[in-house]
């Protein structure tokens, strides 16, 4: 089979739009779906949303999520300068914010209060999760499918321009990644869809199956256009 040619989907964002938004303010919160924990964020002007899976409720896992988040913004040449969050993140953010130069300013909500923008972000993501869940033909979902359902629900909210955002023409994803969507890579298959993956066992002169029964999870970030799948036989992605 011939390899898929790598094509560029880069899009040029006006410099005046990027320069004004270089310093990013985030609202951050935790969210639980079917006992799975996620760290959710939304940027105040770009309206770029994220939902990162947190395997265990320990500081090192949250710091890993924060490092991944900072890398996403830095790759787009943005810098997170301020974070709004609840008091539950006080211990984590006090140590994490000072690791950056200049330090990240952290604004904590008052006692018994929450960050309104972060709460609305959680509510919006959960609405998308419920809508997708009721579209699926399954009565029960494995934990790994729930994990990807939440992460993809947040990611797809970045596909379209936000009416309260900085641009009516450029989506949060386009502004941050400076890349257009590609139908074959990003939209051809839906989460939860039954697919068959091609396998090339080694050695190849056996009666082993050449296709694997899978449930579609999401596209990969590679330029070649790969996909992440849930293998039904092993329940592994």
Can you say where each PLM-predicted feature lies in the sequence?
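Retroviral integrase
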Residues: 1-127, 174-237
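Soluble non-cytosolic domains of exported or imported proteins
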Residues: 60, 144-151
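Active-site proximal helix-loop segment of RNase H-like, two-metal nucleases, encompassing DDE(D)
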Residues: 100-105, 109, 120-142, 156-160, ...
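Active-site rim elements
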Residues: 141-144, 204-205
């Amino acid at each position: 089979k011939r390899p898929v040619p790598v094509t560029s989907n880069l899009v040029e964002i006006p410099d005046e739009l990027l320069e004004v938004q270089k310093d990013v303010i985030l609202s951050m919160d935790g969210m639980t779906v079917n006992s799975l924990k996620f760290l959710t964020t939304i940027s105040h002007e770009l309206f770029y949303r994220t939902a990162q899976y947190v395997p265990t409720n320990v500081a090192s896992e949250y710091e890993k999520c924060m490092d991944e988040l900072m890398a996403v913004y830095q790759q787009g040449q943005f810098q997170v300068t301020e974070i709004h969050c609840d008091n539950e993140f006080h211990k984590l953010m006090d140590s994490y914010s000072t690791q950056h130069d200049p330090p990240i300013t952290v604004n904590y909500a008052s006692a018994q209060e929450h960050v309104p923008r972060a709460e609305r972000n959680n509510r919006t993501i959960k609405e998308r999760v419920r809508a997708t869940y009721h579209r699926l033909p399954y009565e029960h979902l494995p934990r790994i499918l729930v994990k990807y359902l939440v992460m993809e629900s947040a990611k797809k909210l970045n596909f379209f321009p936000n009416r309260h955002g900085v641009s009516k023409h450029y989506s949060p994803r386009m502004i941050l990644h400076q890349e257009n969507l590609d139908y074959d890579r990003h939209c051809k298959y839906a989460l939860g869809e039954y697919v068959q993956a091609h396998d090339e066992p080694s050695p190849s002169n056996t009666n082993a199956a050449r296709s694997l029964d899978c449930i579609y999870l999401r596209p990969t970030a590679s330029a070649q256009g790969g996909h992440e799948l849930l293998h039904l036989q092993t329940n592994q992605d």
